[in-house]
């Protein structure tokens, strides 16, 4: 049998079987202890059931993506949620979330919540910056369910994580989407008599033919793992200019005849995005110097 790990507690994994609402409790085979591969929420797996009706994970299929905070495999898209007011938008923070999503190869949709508090025209430069970078934007008022129908359609056939700073309404959005009646995993603890009083872990929730990670993504915004070569490919609007600079391996920093810098001057790349890139690049380079 094959299915998806939707929850893991204390060495037990709960697998939702394909084309069924059946959830089977499994342990991982001992062979996984001798490899670097540990089962994760979101893993697509093959399982077996023994004569005592005990489940075991036999195989973990190749992951399309892998997040670490929260630890979830095979996420396909991120809804990056911000507000312009309450709390006020922090452009660098928004860019950092976008950077982490790109690093993890996630499709990104930017959601601006609490639109009832602001006039969109006052923020047209920020909106233009995001659109210029190639991201779709959805304007929301989650409390009043404005445009939440669009979000629900996006979730279908995807594994979706919500991310963004505190206070922007991620939990409200999740609650509006999930609703108690759709929570297939909601009664696992009761049914299996395990997990009720354990530390809370991420889990996947099936809703509208899609999967939601039930805890906000990127609880850490640390980018210490990133190298300058990674950074180059995490700013999507730079990609059109790769190979057009004078120097191979151009970092678009102090090098002359740089196609990216020219694109910034001509308005094809937003200056805020370029400034964020330079600031992040210098952080990475300074960290590397300290290492040595």
Curated annotation (Swiss-Prot):
<dbReference type="GO" id="GO:0005525">
    <property type="term" value="F:GTP binding"/>
</dbReference>
<feature type="domain" description="CP-type G">
    <location>
        <begin position="64"/>
        <end position="221"/>
    </location>
</feature>
<dbReference type="GO" id="GO:0046872">
    <property type="term" value="F:metal ion binding"/>
</dbReference>
<keyword id="KW-0690">Ribosome biogenesis</keyword>
<comment type="subunit">
    <text>Monomer. Associates with 30S ribosomal subunit, binds 16S rRNA.</text>
</comment>
<keyword id="KW-0963">Cytoplasm</keyword>
<dbReference type="Pfam" id="PF16745">
    <property type="entry name" value="RsgA_N"/>
</dbReference>
<keyword id="KW-0479">Metal-binding</keyword>
<dbReference type="InterPro" id="IPR004881">
    <property type="entry name" value="Ribosome_biogen_GTPase_RsgA"/>
</dbReference>
<dbReference type="InterPro" id="IPR010914">
    <property type="entry name" value="RsgA_GTPase_dom"/>
</dbReference>
<dbReference type="GO" id="GO:0019843">
    <property type="term" value="F:rRNA binding"/>
</dbReference>
<feature type="binding site">
    <location>
        <begin position="113"/>
        <end position="116"/>
    </location>
    <ligand>
        <name>GTP</name>
    </ligand>
</feature>
<dbReference type="InterPro" id="IPR027417">
    <property type="entry name" value="P-loop_NTPase"/>
</dbReference>
<dbReference type="GO" id="GO:0042274">
    <property type="term" value="P:ribosomal small subunit biogenesis"/>
</dbReference>
<feature type="binding site">
    <location>
        <position position="245"/>
    </location>
    <ligand>
        <name>Zn(2+)</name>
    </ligand>
</feature>
<feature type="binding site">
    <location>
        <position position="258"/>
    </location>
    <ligand>
        <name>Zn(2+)</name>
    </ligand>
</feature>
<keyword id="KW-0342">GTP-binding</keyword>
<feature type="binding site">
    <location>
        <position position="250"/>
    </location>
    <ligand>
        <name>Zn(2+)</name>
    </ligand>
</feature>
<keyword id="KW-0694">RNA-binding</keyword>
<dbReference type="InterPro" id="IPR031944">
    <property type="entry name" value="RsgA_N"/>
</dbReference>
<protein>
    <recommendedName>
        <fullName>Small ribosomal subunit biogenesis GTPase RsgA</fullName>
        <ecNumber>3.6.1.-</ecNumber>
    </recommendedName>
</protein>
<keyword id="KW-0378">Hydrolase</keyword>
<dbReference type="InterPro" id="IPR030378">
    <property type="entry name" value="G_CP_dom"/>
</dbReference>
<feature type="binding site">
    <location>
        <begin position="164"/>
        <end position="172"/>
    </location>
    <ligand>
        <name>GTP</name>
    </ligand>
</feature>
<dbReference type="GO" id="GO:0003924">
    <property type="term" value="F:GTPase activity"/>
</dbReference>
<comment type="similarity">
    <text>Belongs to the TRAFAC class YlqF/YawG GTPase family. RsgA subfamily.</text>
</comment>
<keyword id="KW-0862">Zinc</keyword>
<dbReference type="Pfam" id="PF03193">
    <property type="entry name" value="RsgA_GTPase"/>
</dbReference>
<dbReference type="GO" id="GO:0005737">
    <property type="term" value="C:cytoplasm"/>
</dbReference>
<feature type="binding site">
    <location>
        <position position="252"/>
    </location>
    <ligand>
        <name>Zn(2+)</name>
    </ligand>
</feature>
<keyword id="KW-0699">rRNA-binding</keyword>
<dbReference type="InterPro" id="IPR012340">
    <property type="entry name" value="NA-bd_OB-fold"/>
</dbReference>
<comment type="function">
    <text>One of several proteins that assist in the late maturation steps of the functional core of the 30S ribosomal subunit. Helps release RbfA from mature subunits. May play a role in the assembly of ribosomal proteins into the subunit. Circularly permuted GTPase that catalyzes slow GTP hydrolysis, GTPase activity is stimulated by the 30S ribosomal subunit.</text>
</comment>
<keyword id="KW-0547">Nucleotide-binding</keyword>
């Amino acid at each position: 049998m094959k299915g998806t790990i939707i929850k893991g507690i204390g060495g037990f994994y709960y697998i939702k079987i394909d084309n069924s609402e059946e959830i089977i409790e499994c342990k991982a085979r001992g062979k996984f202890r001798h490899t670097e591969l540990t089962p994760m929420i979101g893993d697509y797996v093959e399982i077996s059931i023994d004569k005592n009706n005990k489940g075991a994970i036999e195989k973990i299929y190749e992951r399309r993506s892998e997040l670490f905070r929260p630890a979830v495999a095979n996420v396909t898209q991120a809804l990056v949620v911000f507000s312009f007011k309450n709390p006020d938008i922090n452009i660098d923070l928004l860019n950092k979330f976008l950077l982490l999503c790109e690093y993890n190869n996630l499709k990104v949709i930017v959601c601006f919540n609490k639109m009832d508090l602001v006039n969109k025209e006052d923020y047209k430069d920020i909106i233009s910056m995001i659109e210029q970078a190639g991201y779709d934007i959805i304007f929301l008022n989650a409390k009043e369910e404005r445009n939440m129908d669009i979000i629900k359609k996006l979730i279908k056939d995807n594994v979706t994580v919500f991310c963004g700073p505190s206070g922007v309404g991620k939990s409200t959005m999740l609650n509006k989407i999930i609703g108690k009646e759709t929570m297939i995993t909601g009664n696992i603890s009761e049914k299996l008599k395990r997990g009720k009083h354990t530390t809370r872990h991420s889990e996947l929730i099936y809703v509208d033919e899609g999967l939601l990670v039930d805890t906000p993504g990127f609880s850490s915004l640390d980018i210490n793992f990133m190298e300058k070569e990674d950074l180059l490919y995490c700013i999507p609007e730079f990609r059109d200019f790769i190979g057009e600079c004078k120097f191979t391996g151009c970092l678009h920093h102090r090098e002359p005849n740089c196609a990216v810098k020219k694109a910034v001057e001509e308005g094809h790349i937003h200056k805020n995005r370029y400034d964020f890139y330079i600031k992040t690049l210098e952080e990475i380079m300074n960290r590397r110097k300290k290492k040595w």
